[in-house]
């Protein structure tokens, strides 16, 4: 495994969450442990009419300007785990103790995060590296929630004239 090849302590739980620990570099031994978090699952979607099996076929990638894209499918990965592995493998970086937390089944409901035994982690500061945009840092909390509600509805026969209203070009925070 990556962790074993780099001489790093590692742990995998029954939900397939992975924790990899890297000791602090010289001079940072007493610093707080930082948890770097990402997820290892992907959205398996393909374009209409594309014959592709995500369990057996390899993603066909190509470069489009500054972007890497996939032919007919989702690209297959977020960059969080790649960033974490790059940090863990670079012995030239000065850093506090690091715990890499790589969770499972984020895309289908954060199942790995919900199943995680947090007592396995020693750090109290977590940086979630799962973001939509390169070069953008979000200060927020990570989480997910499903809400189910019921609203009593009664239907009536439609009368009058249907119209469509469009409002465009306004400045907004969303």
Regions found by a protein language model. Give the residues of each.
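Fold-level recognition of mixed alpha/beta catalytic cores in primary-metabolism enzymes, strongest
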Residues: 95-172
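Short, intrinsically disordered, charge-balanced linker/junction segments flanking boundaries
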Residues: 1, 58-65, 166-174
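Short, ordered beta-strand-loop transition motifs
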Residues: 11-15, 62-66, 159
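Active-site metal-coordination/substrate-binding segment of hydrolases
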Residues: 28-102, 107-108, 114-119, 123-124, ...
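Pocket-edge structural micro-motifs
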Residues: 22, 38, 63, 72, ...
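Structured core elements
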Residues: 11, 19, 35, 128, ...
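A non-catalytic alpha/beta surface segment that caps or lines the substrate-entry region
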Residues: 1-32
